[in-house]
Amino acid sequence: MKLDAKSTIEAGKAILGIELGSTRIKAVLIDQENKPIAQGSHTWENQLVDGLWTYSIEAIWSGLQDCYADLRTNVKNAYGIEIGTLAAIGVSAMMHGYMPFNKKEEILVPFRTWRNTNTGRAAAALSELFVYNIPLRWSISHLYQAILDNESHVNEIDFLTTLAGYVHWQITGEKVLGIGDASGMLPIDPTTHNYSAEMVAKFDKLIAPKEYNWKLEDILPKVLSAGEKAGVLTPEGSKKLDASGHLKAGIPVCPPEGDAGTGMVATNAVKQRTGNVSAGTSSFSMIVLEKELSKPYEMIDMVTTPDGSLVAMVHCNNCTSDLNAWVNLFKEYQELLGIPVDMDEIYSKLYNIALTGDTDCGGLLSYNYISGEPVTGLADGRPLFVRSANDKFNLANFMRTHLYASVGVLKIGNDILFNEEKIKVDRITGHGGLFRTKGVGQRILAAAINSPISVMETAGEGGAWGIALLGSYLVNNEKKQSLADFLDESVFVGDAGIEVSPTPEDVAGFNAYIENYKAGLPIEEAAVKFK
């Protein structure tokens, strides 16, 4: 029998998902049909301490408690009840970074987040040693950089984990990590669903002269796949989440995951030959692979889905910020004329006029580099619009070139996958601000990567919903289905989203544009040098 939201919470059948994002901690309660029934949130910001980006341990727990208290208040206001117990809990967070602890469970240095780029020497050395692309933000890069810098705390390390792994450990007592989050610490072997034994051995040999009193595998969290038991909420853990003391201990907690993995779950993109693209302030694509790539690429990061399939990730620092700045310029012009401003209407009009422009943007070029862009080799960036006297300069082409630029770098990375590695994809789901104006961002992205793009209504629910779904998979998977089948049949049933396919003309036009774009990169380099 289907329970209403109030009865679901009263009966302890609701599932809680919490995600610690870079600017917001969000909690979502879902019902037995995996639909959100209550939410809570807390806003926070990272701090720059001694040149490194961090969040304090105090900020983590006060933020989690405030987020849960907000959820509690919202449940009380909406349904007139307390949350006493739950069917399951899941915790996810931003991936990577560095949280080393000693035997007394004390953090040895402030949490170093994924944003820190002080790990260049370590990442380069490990990429060469492992013959595998090791990004700056990965935990193993942070660990080896601390070793290269002769930091005294390294010998005391008893446990090294991520933010999600830390919170899970503190509320359950279990030193475990979901495979997707673990793949952002150290490369995963897709056959064993564990850390690469070869790379672990190479690392231990590399640091052997230091004579530390630990081996790498001893200090890493145990790797778990979606659906595996990962512990229960302890009495101490319940107090750490719910300062009011109403939440009971003993609730099953699913393996903690990273935000990339929960994003894949929230967009139903964990099956091989599917993918998702997040396009907002920054952008990234995640394509679930059928097999390993033929070789490592510096611009492609390899992670996994929460059930262990390999994923090729292309991450771009810039997406819609420059485009938004131009739209705001048109807003100012409208205000100057004394015309009432409706931002949704301005976006709709400007985005849709772009679709009437030349498919190659009439020769116009835009570089949306508010910051540097590793994929194209620029450490710093300058937003830039360039045209020659003979180019077709009109509003439609102007807006189209800025829309193209918002996914141009993403195209360069994905062209390697589709053209060089011959990767096949059946469905890609788009989510984020670029897709808010119906149909336009979809059509642009479809042309860029020559693939049908779907947009779902639910994609905006985000990672907190994604980790709640993984909690549901832990306790509601009576049929013992794969994660992909569970999502298809119990969550997204009948919701394939609205799909837009690329046209041959748009694809040819974008390909011509991207050749101009790549040829013009020295102009962007000059702008960085002289402006």
Spans of features found by a protein language model:
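N-terminal glycine/serine-rich phosphate-binding loop of ATP-dependent small-molecule kinases
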Residues: 1-110, 124-125, 156, 217, ...
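Active-site core segments that coordinate phosphate-bearing ligands/cofactors
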Residues: 2-10, 16-17, 83, 121-177, ...
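Conserved beta-strand positions that form and line the central face of beta-propeller blades
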Residues: 41, 113, 499
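Short beta-strand-loop/turn "lid" adjacent to the catalytic site in phosphate-handling enzymes
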Residues: 76-113, 133-135, 168-180, 184-189, ...
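Carbohydrate-associated surface elements
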Residues: 116
